[in-house]
């Protein structure tokens, strides 16, 4: 289920930790790169500052056709500028079927999430749930 959701250009919610310890969530585009996940952000955004200070994140994806199925990926991130514009173009084509409209003042970053834990859930309410006969 995890690879299927990631390969289907499913919107995801990225949770980071604010400086005061409170959670901060952002809807993001994501793609798989082997066992790691790539996202794009802009230098100066709150999530960017949060990840620079504390690289621990959680990413949640759910199946729009069956929201009772979801995947949570926990791990740490690193961010680099190299390839930032190329990644947002690739993600924009996957999610919007067109290239990204770049703004010269924006510095794009590649966010690479290295998973430490992956949690998959299928609720008993899901049409995909297969119960046990016991």
Regions found by a protein language model. Name each.
Residues 1-11, 127-134:
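Extreme N-terminal tail/first-helix region
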Residues 9-43, 51, 57-61, 70-72:
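Short beta-strand segments
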Residues 5-6, 51, 91, 113:
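A generic structural signal for nonpolar/aromatic side chains embedded in well-ordered alpha-helices
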Residues 42, 63-64, 115-116:
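Short secondary-structure boundary segments
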């Amino acid at each position: 289920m995890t690879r299927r959701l990631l390969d289907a250009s499913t919107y995801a919610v990225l949770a980071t930790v604010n400086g005061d310890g409170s959670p901060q969530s952002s809807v993001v585009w994501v793609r798989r790169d082997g066992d790691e996940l790539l996202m794009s952000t802009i230098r100066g955004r709150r999530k960017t500052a949060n990840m620079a200070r504390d690289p621990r994140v959680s990413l949640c994806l759910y199946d729009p056709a069956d929201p009772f199925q979801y995947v949570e990926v926990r791990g740490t991130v690193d961010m680099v500028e190299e390839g930032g514009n190329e990644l947002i173009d690739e993600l924009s084509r996957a999610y919007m079927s067109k290239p990204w409209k770049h703004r010269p003042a924006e510095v794009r970053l590649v966010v690479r999430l290295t998973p430490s834990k992956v949690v998959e859930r299928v609720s008993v309410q899901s049409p995909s749930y297969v119960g046990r006969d016991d």
